[in-house]
Amino acid sequence: MGGESTIKIMPMLSLRDASRASAFYQSAFGARELSRSASGEGRIVALLAIGEAEFGVVDEAPQVGNLSPETLGGTSVRISLVVADPDAVAQRAIDAGAELIFPVEDQPYGWRQGRVRDPFGHHWLVGRPIGETA
């Protein structure tokens, strides 16, 4: 792709309360907030990282089509978090306010994995390949 040495995908999660979401992701997944800014309308945009994986959280803006899962009534995207100890990370997310979708278990497709829904409607798969550590 045109001489680029690095290509990254950085999801931007639309939420009803980006400030609260940033705090949740820090507590639940050990995210670090790298930056934060506010638009002229007061909407928050924050850049976070879990390990080396960066993602953004932004207050929803219906006028430009940035809608939260709460507004949409669900989500079609699952975010996969590959970690050494999925049991502990999933439990930490639940303790921070996530809802358990299915528990961390050995799956027939070769992963130890579970799924939680964060308080903002986003689904997180938490796991690792069986027999490996992240």
Regions found by a protein language model. Give the residues of each.
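Conserved beta-strand-loop-alpha-helix junction that forms the acyl-donor binding cleft
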Residues: L15-D17
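Conserved ATPase active-site switch/coordination loops adjacent to the nucleotide-binding site
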Residues: F120
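Vicinal oxygen chelate
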Residues: M1-M12, A23-R117, G127-A134
